[in-house]
Every structure is written in C-alpha cells, then in structure tokens.
C-alpha cells in the first residue's frame, strides 16, 4: 500500500503527556503517518529535556519537527524534572501541576502554528477549550486499551464507583474480573484519571483509540456506541522493526544459550518493585533452572549498585553467576526480545510492552503492578489466552517464588501439552495479525483519510 503523492496538505500537532510510556505511542503514530503520507506536517510539543531523545525516535527525513516547551517552576518540583522517569512518586503530581501552568504557552504556540488538528493526551484535559477558541479541532488519543476507556464512556459514569466492591462490580460488568488489591489500586486513581478522561472525551472533536476489534471487539463496540464523540481506531500501533545491533556485551551473553531458553524479565522504567517483590521474583527465576536476564529499576536518586546488593537474596548473584544477569538501567529491550535465545518474557503488562512481546516468539508471563496493567493482563491471559499471569494473593497482591516458577513452567515446559500448547498457538495467531503490514497500514490510512474529509 503506497499513498505517497496522495496527501492533501495537513498539519497535525502531537502533545503527549511527559512520560515515555505515552510519548512512544505518539512517536510511533507520527512515524506511521509520515511513512504513508510524507506530505503531512507533524509538530511535536515536548519538554526541553526530552527533545533530543524524541528526535532520535522519529523516522529520519520526515516532515516532522519537535518544539521544546518551557516547564514552569513549581515549589517542591526539583529543577530538571521534566518527565515521569525523572520524577519520584511524590513529585509526579507536581509535574502535572507544572504542565497545567503551561496553558498560556500552549495557546500562544497553537495560535502561531495554526494546525488543522491537535492530538493530545489525557492529562491535557484543558486543551480542547483553548484549541476551540482558536478554531482548531482536537483529537483525544487514548494510548490505553479500550477496556480502560470504558468507564469514561459508560452510562454508569453518572454514579462513579466509590468503594472497592463498586470497582470490582464495574470491571466484572465489562467481563474483566479484578482482585481486591487490584481494585484498590484502580480506585486510588479512578476519580482523577477518569475525571480527566471524561473532560478529554467530552471536549474533543473525536477520539482515537490505540486498539483494534481483533483484540477487543465487543468493548470497542460498546465504547463506540456510548461515546459522546466519534471514535476512530488506530490499531495497536506496532513499532517499526528495530534498527542497529544489540550491545556486544549482551549479545555475547545471550549467544551462549540454546534457542528460546532464556527468560527476559523487566518492569519498565517507571515501576519500582518492593524489597519483598524483588526477593521472591529473583528466587522464582532461580527455581526455573533456566538462564535469565533480570532488569530492575530504582528511583533516580539512589545508588543502584548498592540497592541491588541490598535487595537481592543473600548469595544469589554468586549462585546464578553462570546463567543469570541482573542489571539496573536502560537496555535495548526490543533487540533482546527479538534475540533467538530469548523464549520467555516476564513483565508488567504495560500495553507497549505487551505488543513488543506479542510480535516476538517469547512466551508472556505477566506480573502487573498498577492501573491499566491489571486489565491488560486479564485481556491477554483470560480472553485472548495468549499468555499467563502470575498468581497473587487477593487481599494484598503478595506473590512468592513458587508463583513465579509455576507461571513460567506453565508456558516453558511440556510445550506439547496444555495449557502451553494452546497458549503458544494463540500467541502465534496474534503475532501473525500484528505483523500483517497491510492491515496495520489500513488503520493509519483510514484515520488520515477521515481527517482530510473533516
């Protein structure tokens, strides 16, 4: 499918939340649009500290530029903290306050840029009013699966859930059972998150969801029927094939092991496990007897080497030195997942990571830690049956080493029998769908053609 030369001049502004879990899908969307429609002009709005990284993520030679934003000073927000990766859990709220104070700056920029559309994130709930005053249309881009959008489009939103049991009942009505500890986590963010999302949906001209009917058919139908605004699907926005080579240190280590034998374990850049979770996870990986590559992250202001020594079980590093790596810091995750020796992915079920796992041949073992990760995991494990979730205690989410071992064992051993056989086949079918370039391009083309017609 080639649409080059078929592009009416169109100018889009991208304004994601200052978190790379949000910035990345906006970049991927930009890259896919510019590949099919090189005449479409795209302008990114980003915090100054993130500009260079975003520029390296964008396709070269595209009609896309990044404009740095100045983040206002807020008491208590450390200087230089301009995205959630640099913020502590205590200062993320202050980062959002600083973003809210950018409204005059954003209005001035939009008045000068005069784009056709602004594609914005849920934290920027105030943007539709600003854009409307300037005669600019707005698109709310949900980087979440449709199951997270549902409470904000549901007719139940007039009576928001206020207890743990309310949350459990609401999610059950969507066909997604959640445990008590998950409902507590969801309830803690429900009011602010869905209040913002409500304002985004009701204020925008149209809503764009990073999902597809092949993965969430009935929920997408419900969202489309209940939404106050037109709903467009962009598909799961599968990342482009990775470029460059895997770091030689990691490549040499992975090359030592047979195909599909290594467990890669990571929880993203913004999830910090507790001491108990680190201990049980490490011991569970050791119990499998398989080689593993464990990535652990700690807050920016701590000594990572000291934290690894403090939190890992006594003698652990010595016991696993021949078949285990424990690392803290950034790694080339997509390169590692694509390596021939990697056969299992133990992770937090962040949506972007789910897609990265599905397009590779590594079996998914999910250990969700917060909000949308809980429901993402249920969709993959219980509905699509393309992975498994680590069993956890209902009241507090505790998991032990045996729970980790049993989850890995269920997909990595005795693969010719159930449940591993069916899980692997379902994974294969999803991978085939996600790697169908024509289907993915059609989502982008349908979206852009609809924008041209508006």
Swiss-Prot record:
Keywords: Transferase. CDD domains: GT1_Gtf-like. One of its GO terms (molecular function) is UDP-glucosyltransferase activity. Its EC number is 2.4.1.-. It is an enzyme of class 2 (transferase). It holds the Pfam family UDPGT. UDP-alpha-D-glucose binds at residues 269, 330-331, 348-356, 370-373. Transmembrane segments: none annotated. InterPro entries: UDP-glycosyltransf_plant, UDP_glucos_trans. Belongs to the UDP-glycosyltransferase family. May glycosylate diterpenes or flavonols in leaves. This is UDP-glycosyltransferase 79A2. It comes from Stevia rebaudiana (Stevia). The gene is UGT79A2.
């Amino acid at each position: 499918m080639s649409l080059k030369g078929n592009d009416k001049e169109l100018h889009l502004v991208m304004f994601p939340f200052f978190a790379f879990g949000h910035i990345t899908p906006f970049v991927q969307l930009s890259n896919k649009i510019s590949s099919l429609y090189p005449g479409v002009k795209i302008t990114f709005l980003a915090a100054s500290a993130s500009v260079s990284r975003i520029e390296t993520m964008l396709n070269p030679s595209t009609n896309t530029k990044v404009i740095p934003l100045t983040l206002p000073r807020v008491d208590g927000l450390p200087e230089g903290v301009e995205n959630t990766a640099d913020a502590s859990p205590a200062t993320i709220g202050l980062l959002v306050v600083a973003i809210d104070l950018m409204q005059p700056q954003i209005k001035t920029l939009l008045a000068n840029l005069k784009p056709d559309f602004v594609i914005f994130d849920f934290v920027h709930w105030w943007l539709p009013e600003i854009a409307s005053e300037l005669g600019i249309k707005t698109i709310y881009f949900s980087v979440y699966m449709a199951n997270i959008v549902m409470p904000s489009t549901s007719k139940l939103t007039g009576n928001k859930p206020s207890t743990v049991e309310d949350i459990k009942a609401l999610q059950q009505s969507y066909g997604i059972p959640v445990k008590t500890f998950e409902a507590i986590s969801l309830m803690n963010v429900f009011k602010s998150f869905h209040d913002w999302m409500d304002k985004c949906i009701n204020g925008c001209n149209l809503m764009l969801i990073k999902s597809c009917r092949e993965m969430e058919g009935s929920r997408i139908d419900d969202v489309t029927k209940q939404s106050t605004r037109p709903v467009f699907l962009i598909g799961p926005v599968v990342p482009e094939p990775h470029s460059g080579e895997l770091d030689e240190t990691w490549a040499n280590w992975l090359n030592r092991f047979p195909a599909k034998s290594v467990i890669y374990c990571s929880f993203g850049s913004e999830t910090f496990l507790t001491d108990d979770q680190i201990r049980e996870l490490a011991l569970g990986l050791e119990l499998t007897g398989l080689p593993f590559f464990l990535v652990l992250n700690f807050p920016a202001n701590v000594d990572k080497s000291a934290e690894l020594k403090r939190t890992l079980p006594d003698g652990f590093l010595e016991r696993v030195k021949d078949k285990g790596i424990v690392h803290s810091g950034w790694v080339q995750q997509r390169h590692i997942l694509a390596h021939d020796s990697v056969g299992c992915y133990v992770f937090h079920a962040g949506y972007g990571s789910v897609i990265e796992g599905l397009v590779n041949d590594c079996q998914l073992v999910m250990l969700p830690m917060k909000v949308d990760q809980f429901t993402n995991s249920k969709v993959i494990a219980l509905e699509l049956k393309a992975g498994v979730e680590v069993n956890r205690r209902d009241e507090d989410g505790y998991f032990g080493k045996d729970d980790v071992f049993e989850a890995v064992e269920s997909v990595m051993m005795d693969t010719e029998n159930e449940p591993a056989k069916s899980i692997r086949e379902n994974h294969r079918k999803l991978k085939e769908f996600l790697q169908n370039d024509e289907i993915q391009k059609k989502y982008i083309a349908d979206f852009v053609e609809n924008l041209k017609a508006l």
